[in-house]
């Protein structure tokens, strides 16, 4: 048969299948914009700012609606009430991990972030327990972060108050904290092995936030055969996994079951002690990759955005430094006990996380069983997008949400004020495993920097652009330079 005829017949079959799937599902699922055959609602969504497009849809269809990403229906939850009801009140039903094809290729259903069912429960339980035992929120992890904060300050001193782009240095610090927890070892900032690891992690986050990846994730079977940056991401992921496997082999040679040094040792001991199919070398490598992905780039991007916002608002930076001077002084390192006596600094860090909205649409969830949600029927396995933007930028909880204002987290007396709407780490059973670690890092790194340096912009604060350059998977700040002036 003529290849052209085969192609036309194939496209016709695909078109009919798409129309049938859309029509069969739309009566039961929440309402939403009318999808085109095959491509769904992709042309109606801005790949550079997905969250903005979802907000527009919510104005038409309410807090629960359906969009088609390609041929696949995805239910979107918009606003605090809908997000909380799903992730917290119905946590078990909404605890599945939704589909991200490019990352599924990397994880193969293993690890912490992109696994499901028993694998996810076992990995999450083990990771939380191990991180707690090594001091998640306790003293030993704090010691490691304080050590890295001192190294960070020394690296910043080496800039000699000259203009610099802080991206690399601010990436090294949280990466080294993860290395300390996982490998029992930190790296010099000029170590070639470390630099290559950093480069691979940085590039993959940029790729994940690109419009091309949003398109790829909707048509993976087709685009696998075409060149593109998805190939670069997979190549980087292979490098990271090979790097981790080499470290695992080194640990196997030196393993002392009575004296575990780090996360890898604990995992290897678990493998020896239990005949558990969830604990294999491959799942160890993926779990460590997940910890790197979650614990390095997210924190470094937040730090980078933090300094940009403090440059934009020098009066805020000055007030934080006054509080540091009053509570900590100049002659000792900041510690976590200081945070309770520094309400303004605590409010500033919370406001930074709220304002930058690092993961606008969260990682996708999926329902683990058929669910009736607000009178709509959502079949088992349906992907769920929870708009964290709609929660963090809620006008009732945070008046003038588009304005950077630490007062969003302060009461009338200047005391720190908690908010249920503060969900930068998501909520419920899939809440970020490394939340405690990230909170400690943000506080200790930022206070250490501001204790030792005045931040100086190269342009007038009013001329600084703080608009995220990409709002896809991660909100990425624009590039900038500054001077670290020793105090």
Curated annotation (Swiss-Prot):
Heme binds at residue 432. It is found in: Endoplasmic reticulum membrane; Microsome membrane. This is Cytochrome P450 2C5. It comes from Oryctolagus cuniculus. It comes from the Eukaryota. Its cofactor is heme. The gene is CYP2C5. The keyword Heme applies. One of its GO terms (cellular component) is endoplasmic reticulum membrane.
């Amino acid at each position: 048969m003529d290849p052209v005829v085969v192609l036309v017949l194939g496209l016709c079959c695909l078109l009919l299948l798409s129309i049938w799937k859309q029509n069969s599902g739309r009566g039961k699922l929440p309402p939403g914009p009318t999808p085109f055959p095959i491509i769904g609602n992709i042309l109606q969504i801005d790949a550079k700012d997905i969250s903005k497009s979802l907000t527009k849809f919510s104005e038409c269809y309410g807090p629960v609606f359906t969009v088609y990403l390609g041929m696949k229906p995805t239910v979107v939850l918009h606003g605090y009430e809908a997000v909380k009801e799903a992730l917290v009140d119905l946590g078990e039903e909404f605890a599945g991990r939704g589909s991200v094809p490019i990352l599924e290729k990397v994880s193969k259903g293993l690890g912490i972030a992109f696994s499901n069912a028993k694998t996810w429960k076992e990995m999450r339980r083990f990771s939380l327990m191990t991180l707690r035992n090594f001091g998640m929120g306790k003293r030993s992890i704090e010691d490691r972060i304080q050590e890295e904060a001192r190294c960070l300050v020394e690296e910043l001193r080496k800039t000699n108050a000259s203009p610099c782009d802080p991206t690399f240095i601010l990436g090294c610090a949280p990466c080294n904290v993860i290395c300390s927890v996982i490998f029992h070892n930190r790296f010099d900032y000029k170590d070639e092995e470390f630099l290559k690891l950093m480069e691979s992690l940085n590039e993959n986050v940029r790729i994940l936030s690109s419009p091309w990846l949003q398109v790829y994730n909707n048509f993976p079977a087709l685009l696998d055969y075409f060149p593109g940056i998805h190939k670069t991401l997979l190549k980087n992921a292979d490098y990271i996994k090979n790097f981790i496997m080499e470290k695992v082999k080194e640990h196997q040679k030196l393993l002392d079951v009575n004296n575990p040094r780090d996360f890898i040792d604990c995992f290897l001991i678990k493998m020896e002690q239990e005949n558990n199919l969830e604990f294999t070398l491959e799942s160890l490598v993926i779990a460590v990759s997940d910890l790197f992905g979650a614990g390095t780039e997210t924190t470094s991007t937040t730090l980078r955005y933090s300094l940009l916002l403090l440059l934009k608002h020098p009066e805020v930076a000055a007030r934080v430094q006054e509080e540091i001077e009053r509570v900590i002084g100049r002659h000792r390192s900041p510690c976590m006990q200081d945070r309770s006596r520094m309400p303004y600094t605590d409010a500033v860090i919370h406001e930074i996380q709220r304002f930058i909205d690092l993961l606008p649409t969260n990682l996708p969830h999926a329902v683990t069983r058929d669910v009736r949600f607000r009178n709509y029927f959502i079949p088992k396995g349906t992907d769920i997008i929870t708009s964290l933007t709609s929660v963090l930028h809620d006008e009732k909880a945070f008046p003038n949400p588009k304005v950077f204002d630490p007062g969003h987290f302060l009461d009338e007396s200047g005391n720190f004020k908690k908010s249920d709407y503060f969900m930068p780490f998501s909520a419920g059973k899939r809440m970020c495993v490394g939340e405690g670690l990230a909170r400690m890092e943000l506080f200790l790194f930022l206070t250490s920097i501001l204790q030792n340096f005045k931040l100086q912009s190269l342009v007038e604060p009013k001329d600084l652009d703080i608009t995220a350059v990409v709002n896809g998977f991660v909100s990425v700040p624009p590039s900038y330079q500054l001077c670290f002036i020793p105090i």
